[in-house]
């Protein structure tokens, strides 16, 4: 029997209500005239007469879609507004839980992305989204989903509302203290995590919560890239670079002390927090799998794909961190043009840099091996390349190096065969390197 379809009450609601005036806020103005045509396929376990359950199904449809659909998003906001109004009447009075308020807030948050390119100010969307969070928290003070959602909205707000308006010459005047804004988000996320663990609600460590951590990761990347020197084909010449404040030997802009992003660029706090919380998220995801008797390395299950994505992201973060000490070791060990090698680079001698790099790459491999799935040749190649990197850090012809290259070769041969030669070039380079070292 096919799952039921129905328009979620959107058409009925649209017929009864006129377009709202400005004082009613963003939510109503975001609704679409086509919302009445919106239908969603419900799972069999969803009650076709339960409008709140239907809203949850519609939200899951939006999140799971390959391409964002503004019509669906407007329909969600329209339906949230209708349900909220109905819940406040004597005739239809009923309680809306934290999940409802979280969906309403996150839908407004997502709507800001659609309007960012068309409007100068997305502030009203984020203001109203956080108002919906506060409304939900007034009824469910420690609801983890609401607290996770609050962090998500803040992590999106910073780049979309604040950083998008900044230039290299911007000063802190006119902007909030970005560190305080982010700290509010960290506090909210940690409170949500603690409550979810305390109440053993491990099902909350899902794709939606991982999107919160992803949004912070994206934000940190934006901050890292802010003021990076553009290539000559983008219209920046040497005189422009000097005027903007680029150092001659550096690729990044030197922000003034009064720039709102200056403190963030100098702090590692948020990068460390992201990794710490991502590791904690992974542990809780694995607890959920254990509690539910789920085999994680099953890519046919959503939790299996999520587990792979989290492990891969952690592995890549350790590899990225290893790049600097690896480069320092290689330069000091093999570059004959470097003078005063005994002074080291960035306070590190060759042996120190190598030890740090080995530790980081070893950590990376542990996570990448967790992300290694039997039906994913790319995951085998990712582990192989990490083993090559680790092998390059060990002494030439050492047992450790040979062991690393051997593990890499086996995986690359397997991946190359499965993909009909996709990794032939990498495999040949490894074999040639092994041959040259003998």
Swiss-Prot record:
Protein name per UniProt: Enhancer of translation termination 1
GO biological process, one term: regulation of translation
InterPro entries assigned: Nro1/ETT1 (IPR024318)
PANTHER family: ENHANCER OF TRANSLATION TERMINATION 1
Region (Disordered): 1-41, 230-262
Keyword Oxidoreductase belongs to the record: no
Residue stretches of biased makeup (Acidic residues): 234-252
Its biological purpose: Required for correct translation termination and probably involved in regulation of hypoxic gene expression.
Family: Belongs to the ETT1 family.
Gene Ontology CC terms: nucleus
């Amino acid at each position: 029997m096919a799952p039921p379809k129905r328009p979620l009450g959107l058409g009925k609601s649209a017929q009864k209500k006129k377009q709202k005036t400005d004082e009613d806020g963003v939510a109503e103005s975001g609704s679409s005239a086509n919302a009445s045509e919106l239908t969603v396929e419900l799972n069999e376990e969803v009650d076709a007469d339960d409008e709140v359950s239907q809203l949850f199904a519609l939200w899951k449809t939006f999140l799971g879609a390959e391409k964002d659909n503004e019509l669906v998003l407007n329909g969600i906001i329209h339906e949230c507004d209708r349900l909220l109004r109905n819940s406040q009447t004597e005739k239809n009075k009923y309680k809306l839980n934290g999940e409802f308020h979280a969906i309403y807030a996150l839908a407004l948050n997502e709507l800001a992305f659609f309007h960012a390119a068309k409007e100068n100010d997305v502030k009203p969307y984020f203001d109203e989204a956080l108002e919906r969070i506060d409304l939900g928290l007034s009824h469910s003070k420690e609801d983890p989903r609401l607290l996770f959602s609050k962090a998500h909205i803040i992590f999106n707000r910073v780049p979309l509302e604040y950083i998008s308006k900044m230039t290299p010459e911007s000063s802190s005047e006119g902007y909030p203290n970005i560190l305080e804004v982010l700290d509010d988000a960290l506090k909210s996320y940690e409170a949500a995590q603690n409550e979810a663990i305390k109440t053993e609600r491990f099902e909350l460590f899902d794709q939606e919560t991982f999107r919160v951590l992803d949004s912070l990761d994206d934000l940190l990347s934006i901050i890292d890239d802010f003021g990076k020197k553009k290539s000559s084909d983008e219209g920046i010449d040497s005189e422009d670079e000097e005027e903007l404040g680029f150092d001659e030997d550096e690729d990044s802009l030197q922000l003034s002390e009064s720039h709102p992003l200056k403190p963030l660029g100098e702090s590692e706090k948020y990068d460390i927090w992201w990794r710490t919380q991502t590791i904690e998220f992974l542990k809780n995801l694995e607890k959920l799998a254990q509690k539910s008797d789920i085999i994680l390395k099953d890519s046919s299950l959503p939790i299996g794909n999520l587990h792979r994505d989290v492990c891969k992201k952690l592995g890549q973060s350790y590899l990225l961190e290893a790049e600097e000490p690896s480069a320092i070791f290689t330069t000091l060990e093999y570059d004959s043009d470097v003078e005063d090698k005994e002074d080291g680079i960035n306070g590190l001698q060759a042996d120190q840099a190598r030890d740090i790099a080995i530790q980081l790459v070893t950590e990376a491999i542990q996570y990448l091996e967790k992300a290694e799935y039997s039906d994913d040749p790319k995951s085998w190649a990712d582990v192989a390349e990490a083993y090559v990197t680790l092998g390059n850090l060990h002494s030439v012809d050492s047992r450790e190096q040979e062991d690393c290259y051997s593990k890499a070769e086996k995986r690359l041969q397997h991946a190359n065969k499965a993909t009909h030669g996709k990794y032939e070039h990498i495999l040949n380079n490894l074999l040639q390197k092994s041959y040259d070292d003998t």
